[in-house]
């Protein structure tokens, strides 16, 4: 009798920088999976800061944050060190293959559109994100949109796909 596998081909395809399979990790503990844009983006930096602030609540609920990024592991390490979460699990995806997987299906938008988007300008200036988190040049794919997924038992339970780069996800509702 042949054994039936409940594993998806995606299971083996996504590994963290430490070599752990993402969906296997979500079978051990729930995962808050945060897809970042580029490290020069104010809102990317804000997402890292937001998750850092939520770290005690995530730990209380036994939820492990994992970040997916387009940058080099060295640049990522510097950012996560700066925000106080140097040992957080990370996935290096310079070609954005994981971002485009049907299970995540994150959009793309020309970076120039952000400059004429009132919600983005509101986030930068009125909310003060540009002053709090800074901004620098786009060093990876600036078209890539971010997103956040809550994984449990090898499945996506809830998701938040950004419509614009300044969208503010409700992390606590997402991990509900």
Q: What is each residue range found by the language model?
A:
Residues 22-51, 64:
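Short active-site neighborhood of thiol/selenol oxidoreductases, capturing the structured segment around
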Residues 17, 27-28, 60, 143:
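A generic fold-level signal
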Residues 1-24, 46:
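N-terminal "domain-start" segment that seeds a small globular fold
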